[in-house]
A protein has these predicted regions:
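Periplasmic-binding protein-like
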Residues: 133-137, 219-258, 281-297
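N-terminal secretory signal peptides
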Residues: 1-10, 17-30
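A ligand-binding cleft/hinge motif common to bilobed small-molecule-binding domains
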Residues: 115-123, 172-175, 202-238
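Extracytoplasmic small-molecule ligand-binding "clamshell" domains
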Residues: 20, 39-113
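Bilobed "Venus flytrap"/periplasmic-binding protein-like clamshell domains
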Residues: 51-52, 56-59, 69-84, 135-193, ...
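Ligand-binding clefts/hinges and TM-proximal coupling segments of bilobed small-molecule sensing domains
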Residues: 168-183, 223, 256-297
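Acidic, polar ligand-binding/catalytic clefts
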Residues: 78, 89-153
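Extended ligand-binding regions for polar small-molecule ligands
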Residues: 33, 74-83, 144, 152, ...
């Protein structure tokens, strides 16, 4: 890991602190709010502009080295909104745990951050149809000397594990019997990588997509990613699927978005869009994975 690599990523974190990055065009600061009344979809069509929120988590939604927003979710959102006649997508960077509160406060209109669909989140906002599904994995030292391959191994061997703030993995870990004092909550993927590399924790839990991307972008660091798996809760595998998030009152926007998202999924265009970010055909949600089921789980 070179000092220059860390410096570039520190730029991403500083961008997040200021709250706005570009999606092909200059963006408004996150302090600026969206239309306070009326139909959000019609307002977006009239202005040809929609505002999205991201959390700067690669490869789901992040700023590249030039400050342009990209990633799986922003690129899918861009394709959907283009089909709806909305040409410009403006992005605000918000800490992950503040995305839904900022959405509710109308700082932007859609969360495009690959957010996992959970029962708790569904009480606060409305999710699109599942955009993708992903397995969970662990970032471990090269060679995985402790042979930690699943969350239950973390519990059994009492190793320390890192998770991202407000991410679902902490719940998966505690559900697998991992004690709170084994879990270290961190604010960025880079800090997760550092913690494993430096030996402050043995492993880090996140989606296999995120961890593979992290390793790919940091060659030379002595870490590896375990095979992906579904976490187990109450003896049953937990399906992890993410989607886009809307305010509960924005049904017309959500419904129109879902219709175009389905077209992308069905046509194969979605796979083309997301392949550069480590996603593929296997990440298309199965037909029985629905928002209704995920919100009730």
């Amino acid at each position: 890991m070179t000092h220059g690599e860390w410096t570039r990523r520190d730029f991403f974190r500083r961008s997040a602190a200021f709250g706005a990055v570009a999606v092909g065009v200059p963006t408004l600061l996150s302090a600026c709010t969206t239309t306070s009344s009326g139909d959000t979809l019609q307002a977006a069509k009239s202005s040809k502009t929609i505002k999205i929120g991201i959390a700067n988590e690669a490869p789901y939604g992040f700023a590249d080295s030039s400050g342009i927003t990209t990633g799986e979710a922003p690129e899918v959102a861009r394709a959907v909104f283009k089909a709806l006649g909305v040409d410009q997508v403006q992005a605000s960077v918000v800490p992950f745990d503040q995305l839904i509160p900022a959405l509710t406060a109308k700082q932007f209109d859609v969360v495009a951050a690959g957010m996992n669909i959970t029962k708790k989140r569904c009480t606060a906002a409305a999710f699109s149809a599942p955009d993708y599904s992903a397995l969970t994995a662990l970032l471990v030292p090269k060679g995985n000397p402790q042979q930690i391959l699943k969350l239950e191994d973390v519990a059994a061997k009492k190793v320390k594990v890192a998770v991202l703030s407000a991410a679902v993995e902490k719940g998966y870990l505690t559900g697998a019997g991992v004690s709170e004092n084994q879990i270290q909550t961190l604010d960025t993927q880079d800090n997760m990588l550092r913690s494993v590399s430096d030996g402050r924790v043995y492993c880090a839990a996140l989606t296999d997509i995120s961890l593979k991307w992290l390793v790919q972008k940091n060659p030379g660091v002595a870490v590896e990613v375990t095979p992906g798996f579904d976490p187990v809760e109450n003896g049953q595998p937990v399906v992890s699927a993410g989607g886009f998030v809307f305010r509960k009152e924005d049904n017309s926007l959500k419904d129109a978005f879902n219709a175009e998202l389905k077209k992308l999924h069905d046509s194969g265009e979605w796979v083309r869009i997301v392949t550069p970010f480590g996603f593929g055909q296997s990440n298309l949600p199965k037909a029985d994975v629905t928002t209704e089921k995920l919100c009730a789980a």
